Amino acid sequence: MDVNMAAELSPTNSSSSGELSVSPEPPRETQAFLGKVTVIDYFTFQHKHLKVTNIDDMTETLYVKLPENMTRCDHLPITCEYLLGRGSYGAVYAHADNATVKLYDSVTELYHELMVCDMIQIGKATAEDGQDKALVDYLSACTSCHALFMPQFRCSLQDYGHWHDGSIEPLVRGFQGLKDAVYFLNRHCGLFHSDISPSNILVDFTDTMWGMGRLVLTDYGTASLHDRNKMLDVRLKSSKGRQLYRLYCQREPFSIAKDTYKPLCLLSKCYILRGAGHIPDPSACGPVGAQTALRLDLQSLGYSLLYGIMHLADSTHKIPYPNPDMGFDRSDPLYFLQFAAPKVVLLEVLSQMWNLNLDMGLTSCGESPCVDVTAEHMSQFLQWCRSLKKRFKESYFFNCRPRFEHPHLPGLVAELLADDFFGPDGRRG
């Protein structure tokens, strides 16, 4: 019996007539009162989320179905009047008050993101350490309309345009929260985001037009389970038992992260595979290891932070970070090598400025101890690096040095990119 309840039922709380007298108490939140979710709380919460219908231990397969509220079209009409963004999945529109609706061209893409969003939401319901605060919530879904409803934010970090001295503190604080969110996704939800970039980081509203609000991670359209999960085969079925979708976990390096924000370890793998003319079959690949997934997500987050640093410093837009756009076809090994050049040069500049020792396994002088870069390709890489260094000198980057003196910024960059290395096995290679 709960200690407080026992006290209420003790003889000292009885009236002289022998009747039970319970003193009224001010209302208290369940979380604050009990410290965690109760069984009844779980029942009232769970009926709105994915339900397990069967577990096949022989094949290690988990079968789930959608709750009824996701299959009913009982939301406000979707007008598609105010377009907020568009992508390969479909489009995002403003919806009702302070909400957005993400409309999918394909229902299978909706099923994927909806399943991942719901898994995260279930994880957030039992979170106690606050690491989940920088993960976007979803409000509801409608499979009939191919729609996912979410809170409204000002814009993505990629579209944010008010960079000034006052942006430094919220940028650092925001990325510290995003780092916690990546750990929460990996360790509490068993998920690999695999597509962290400024376009998938949302900026919240503030009281002023020029203030940077909190940063929130979104877009789980390519998220997958990592190998630390007990079951990796998760299938969504209809109420009549028809299979609607199978949540994949097989990943190969070309499909992980946007090419512009691929960590150096992934760029090196893609460079090697393209040079050998080898294209991996995704169905023959396994799930990404939990630690590898964590490292890759943190590294992509680190290069997204460098994007913010560049916008704080390069008001002339002379430095093409992260995309040099050299016009190579994706089948050319140089296509992947080109994205390494701005990362290497920028990190060398920051290492010198902050007195850090960031060994990335590739230098602007042409040192590549773990990857055999051909002489022709290295010559091209060195030319890119020389051009980038010239652009740094022509920009206002070095005039903005005071903006980089935030006490936590150097350590945060070093922590996020600590394990990245231009080699097929990363830092451990």
Swiss-Prot record:
Residues 1-409 form the Protein kinase domain. Residues 1-27 are annotated as: Disordered. ATP binds at residues 110-118, 128. Its EC number is 2.7.11.1. It is found in: Virion tegument; Host nucleus. It is an enzyme of class 2 (transferase). Keywords: ATP-binding, Early protein, Host nucleus, Host-virus interaction, Inhibition of host innate immune response by virus, Inhibition of host IRF3 by virus, Inhibition of host RLR pathway by virus, Kinase, Modulation of host chromatin by virus, Nucleotide-binding, Serine/threonine-protein kinase, Transferase, Viral immunoevasion, Virion, Virion tegument. One of its GO terms (cellular component) is viral tegument. It catalyses: L-seryl-[protein] + ATP = O-phospho-L-seryl-[protein] + ADP + H(+); L-threonyl-[protein] + ATP = O-phospho-L-threonyl-[protein] + ADP + H(+). The active site is at 195 (proton acceptor). Gene3D superfamilies: Transferase(Phosphotransferase) domain 1 (1.10.510.10). The keyword Transcription regulation does not apply. One of its GO terms (molecular function) is protein serine/threonine kinase activity. Plays many key roles by phosphorylating several proteins including the viral DNA processivity factor BMRF1, EBNA1 or EBNA2. Modifies the host nuclear envelope structure and induces the redistribution of nuclear envelope-associated proteins by phosphorylating host nucleoporins. Subsequently, promotes the nuclear transport of EBV lytic proteins. Required for efficient lytic DNA replication and release of nucleocapsids from the nucleus. Interacts with host NUP62 and NUP153; this interaction plays a role in nuclear targeting of BGLF4. Interacts with host SUMO1 and SUMO2. Belongs to the protein kinase superfamily. Ser/Thr protein kinase family. This is Serine/threonine-protein kinase BGLF4. It comes from Epstein-Barr virus (strain B95-8).
